[in-house]
Structure formats: C-alpha cells, structure tokens
Amino acid sequence: MEDQMANLRLTDFEFFRIILPGSSKTKLKLPYKFARELGDRELREARLRVAGEGRRPWDVKVFDDDVSGDVYLGRGWQEFARAHDLRDGHFLVFRYDGAAAFTVTVFDETMCRRDYRRHHDAAESGSSSSSDSSDAAAAVATAAAEGVGDVALSQFAVTLRQCNLEDKQAQYLNVPMEFQEAHEYARREKVVLRMRGEAWTVRLKHSRRERGQRTAFRYGWHRFCVDNGLAVGDTCFFRVLREGDLRRGGAADDHVLKVAVRKADGTTLE
C-alpha cells in the first residue's frame, strides 16, 4: 500500500532536462528532487515514450552512481537519443506516468516542439543502409498529432532581448499570442512566477493591436529579472503549473507558471 501511495504522489510529476554541449551521450541524470521522491523504491528500468507516439515505449536502464548518489538513465538512452535526433540545446520535458513510464516532449533550438513526422517524411525519401536505421526511422515516425495542442500550449520559451531588460519603468515581456489566448489572459490581471522555490507576482498589461489584444508581463517582471540575475541572451522556459479559477475573477485567481532559465553561458536555473 505504501508503494502504491508513493506512485500516486509521483504520477504526473514533471521535470526538464537540457542537452548541454559536452554532456554524456550514454546517460542522462535525473533531477535530485525526483530521485528523492522515489525514496527506497528501486527503479531499475524505465519506459520512455515521445508525446503522441503510438508504438511501444523504449526500454532504458536506470542506475545509481555509488559515489555521488545521483540517479541516471543509462543503457538504452543513447539509442533513444539517436533515434529522436536529440542534439545540444534541445529542451526535454519529462512527465512521469507511473509504473516506471515517462512521456517525453522535445523542443529544439527554435524553441518549438519538434515535429518528428516531418523528419520521417524526409528520411523516407532516401534509402536505408541497414535494418537498424530503418527501425529508428520507423520509431521516429510514430509521433502523431494526438495531444500536441494541449502540450504545446501549456508552455512557451523566450530568449531575452534588451527591451525585456530595460529600466524598471519600461521593462516588459510579451506573452505569445497562442499561449495568452489558450489561457484567457485577457480576463486575468496577474500571474505568479515560481522558480528556485520562490514566487513572484507579476501584473499583466493589456493593449489593443490590429491583430487583437496583446498581453505582456509588466509590473513585477523587473523584480523577477533582478532577483534571478537575468541577462540578454538568457532563455526563459515558462510552463503552466496551476491554471487558476477564472470564475473567481481575474484579480483573485492564482495562475501559476513554473520558470526555468538556460543562461547564455549554458548553465541553468530552475
């Protein structure tokens, strides 16, 4: 019963990993917090599935580093990464589905969700030199359109420019149109940004444009940037942590975004 309750706590647990230059190609470290939540349970094998993929999951071994105590995805990870063409700078969102299964969503260097169907179409136009490469292409091709909208609209990424980091009175960050429409930002007055265990309340500024209403992070955004030492070239990843209840009114709802940052030098904040 205790193991079942622990599994319930972990179900839908999400974390991200960034493929950094020089990182190991044969293993991927799992976040300390996730490993801690596993507790004494031994997770020896995981099943990875790209979001929307219809075929069987990929089997990947899980191991502990006896010296550091860190937990890694090991044997099988390199094959998964190669089949899905994971490269430096790619941003991976893992969702734990329970029973050692993970759903993985991949965002590439354009900060957009990767469309594996398009890559497969290009691969099919060429010839396959071995059964291994054919199998890998077939696995990549199974990514389908199911669920793409929900996942894609639950998060967005922005690389900071000078206009996002000007003096306190002029500082702002525009929210992508599709994201703000999906979460009804026109009816909201504020959002809460969470990072590194802390929270910042940011007021929203709405303005009318030819293509419709535009929403930007405004008052409170400056404090968030200063407190976290953000600079031009840093990339911020925003993900909906809690939607908030609009029925209580825009001023009273608690719409929460989880923020992670990839600094221009390759280090990360989360």
Swiss-Prot record:
<dbReference type="GO" id="GO:0003677">
    <property type="term" value="F:DNA binding"/>
</dbReference>
<protein>
    <recommendedName>
        <fullName>B3 domain-containing protein Os03g0212300</fullName>
    </recommendedName>
</protein>
<keyword id="KW-0238">DNA-binding</keyword>
<dbReference type="GO" id="GO:0005634">
    <property type="term" value="C:nucleus"/>
</dbReference>
<keyword id="KW-0539">Nucleus</keyword>
<dbReference type="InterPro" id="IPR039218">
    <property type="entry name" value="REM_fam"/>
</dbReference>
<keyword id="KW-0677">Repeat</keyword>
<feature type="DNA-binding region" description="TF-B3 1">
    <location>
        <begin position="13"/>
        <end position="110"/>
    </location>
</feature>
<dbReference type="InterPro" id="IPR003340">
    <property type="entry name" value="B3_DNA-bd"/>
</dbReference>
<keyword id="KW-0804">Transcription</keyword>
<dbReference type="InterPro" id="IPR015300">
    <property type="entry name" value="DNA-bd_pseudobarrel_sf"/>
</dbReference>
<keyword id="KW-0805">Transcription regulation</keyword>
<feature type="DNA-binding region" description="TF-B3 2">
    <location>
        <begin position="158"/>
        <end position="265"/>
    </location>
</feature>
<dbReference type="Pfam" id="PF02362">
    <property type="entry name" value="B3"/>
</dbReference>
